[in-house]
Amino acid sequence: MYLDINWEEDSIPENERGSLTGLLEQGIAKAVHLSAESEEAEVSLTLVDDARIHELNRDYRGVDRPTDVLSFALQEERSDEPDILDYEDHLLGDIIISVERARAQAIDYGHSFERELVYLAVHGTLHLLGYDHMEEEDKEEMRRQEEAVMSQIGLLR
């Protein structure tokens, strides 16, 4: 598992980044292993502020507001592929997370910032693997996968 983290958002002190990096690596690696049954994957994770994710959300999705997480898969699922993607080259894509949204949501949901940040990374990884939550059945499956990963790494609600 290779995770490249870009710390564009400077509200996370240098001395906290090491422990967060470990948790993020665990979460993403577990999501890949559970969903794609692989230990090998490459993901780029960028932590940004609300202004930057708002810009990206507007430019790439046509939604003119900030969001918590965006995922950009390097390979898109085609109609002749299985529902859950399995990449031979292991390059999954990019995940962008708003640190401001993660902090606010952690407060709203009554759990730690670390848990929320890792949850968003897991959520983004599952999108890279082909999961979605547009239909209720798909949403339930995605939530099961998210909770399984979070439970395995001990970051429960």
From Swiss-Prot:
Main location: cytoplasm
GO CC annotations on file: cytoplasm
Residues that hold Zn(2+) according to the record: H123, H127, H133
This enzyme's EC code(s): 3.1.-.-
Cofactor: binding details: Binds 1 zinc ion.
Nucleotide-binding listed as a keyword: no
Cofactor(s) listed: Zn(2+)
One GO BP: rRNA processing
Localization of this protein: Cytoplasm
Annotated InterPro entries: MetalPrtase_cat_dom_sf_prd (IPR023091), YbeY (IPR002036), YbeY_CS (IPR020549)
UniProt KW keywords: Cytoplasm, Endonuclease, Hydrolase, Metal-binding, Nuclease, Ribosome biogenesis, rRNA processing, Zinc
Key word Metal-binding present: yes
Gene Ontology terms, MF aspect: metalloendopeptidase activity; RNA endonuclease activity; zinc ion binding
Leading EC class: hydrolase
Function, as annotated: Single strand-specific metallo-endoribonuclease involved in late-stage 70S ribosome quality control and in maturation of the 3' terminus of the 16S rRNA.
PANTHER family cross-referenced by the UniProt entry: ENDORIBONUCLEASE YBEY, CHLOROPLASTIC
Family to which this protein belongs: Belongs to the endoribonuclease YbeY family.
Identification of the protein by name: Endoribonuclease YbeY
Organism from which the protein derives: Desulfitobacterium hafniense (strain DSM 10664 / DCB-2)
